[in-house]
């Protein structure tokens, strides 16, 4: 299995499924978002405190490829890796069904930092990535 910087295990809930009995497409976006937030919290990041300091992280682009559908009750492993590209922080994310590790979705999410209303060069991300390297 591919190596990841961060993983999170969760379970599909009934209300996340459509009439076909599979996870509704937008819920994969929620799964990925939740994983990113948990990852950032594990680094000590807090979006509320950042905002109070005039620093806001925004998603600038999302691309999700749907490979195999998850169903109600399925357990899954939501995984991510991260790197900086120019001013953006790029999250590469996979969701694998458990226990067989079948790839359900893969996605790329790009994020930028706006400080006091202005797009930055991503210096905040540089500091965050240094903390990851030192872990």
Regions found by a protein language model. Name each.
Residues 2-59, 114-135:
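Hot-dog-fold acyl-thioester-processing enzymes
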Residues 7-9, 63, 108:
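Generic structural signal for residues positioned in beta-strands
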Residues 12-16, 62-68, 99:
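Short, well-ordered turn and helix-capping elements at secondary-structure junctions
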Residues 39-90, 106:
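Hydrophobic beta-strand-centered segment that forms part of the acyl-chain substrate-binding groove
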Residues 66, 71-72, 82-135:
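HotDog/MaoC-like acyl-thioester-processing domains
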